Amino acid sequence: MDARTIIESLTGKFPEAISEAGIESPIRIRAYVDKDKAKEVCEYLKGSLQFDHLCSVSGVDYPQRDELEAVYHIASYDHPVVLMLKARLPRDSPEIESVVSVYWNANWYERETYELYGIFFKNHPELKPLVLPDDMLGEWPLRKDYEGFPNRTARNLV
């Protein structure tokens, strides 16, 4: 399956949920997904398009746009294509459905993203602290408006 076929399948199946889909190279594609459809799209990617490996989940902060993005990199063992799937989230209440039930390894990725950006993954089985000390919880140190840098970073607390 090539990049164009994957894009056509995604946009055909989810015409209202997928936007700005494009091919960056023969092996890299990108798309935005409606935050309320992200889990369903991931289920389709895994079940129908053989995107069986979640490589990462992370966040990006855009304070000037008043939003965060949840970013998923998903690959396939059956075809040489990596998909970057992004979901825009409002900065004041960034939440999205967890994909742990689709990709088991999303567990720690989502925990880390929650801890560092404040993106809440609904229905995550155990959204508890992973890397930050207790007194930094809720400070979202990777957001661009974090005021604790450089004195309140984990590196300086050790």
Swiss-Prot record:
Purpose of the protein: Component of the F(420)H(2) dehydrogenase (FPO complex) which is part of the energy-conserving F(420)H(2):heterodisulfide oxidoreductase system. The membrane-bound electron transfer system of the complex plays an important role in the metabolism of methylotrophic methanogens when the organisms grow on methanol or methylamines. Catalyzes the oxidation of methanophenazine to dihydromethanophenazine. It shuttles electrons from F(420)H(2), via FAD and iron-sulfur (Fe-S) centers, to methanophenazine (an electron carrier in the membrane).
Keywords on record: Cell membrane, Electron transport, Membrane, Methanogenesis, Methanol utilization, Oxidoreductase, Transport
One Pfam family, short name: Complex1_30kDa
Keyword Electron transport on entry: yes
Name of the featured protein: F(420)H(2) dehydrogenase subunit C
Organism per entry: Methanosarcina mazei (strain ATCC BAA-159 / DSM 3647 / Goe1 / Go1 / JCM 11833 / OCM 88) (Methanosarcina frisia)
NCBIfam families from the UniProt entry: F420_dehyd_FpoC, NuoC_fam, PRK06074.2-2
E.C. no: 1.5.98.3
Subunit structure: The FPO complex is composed of at least 13 different subunits.
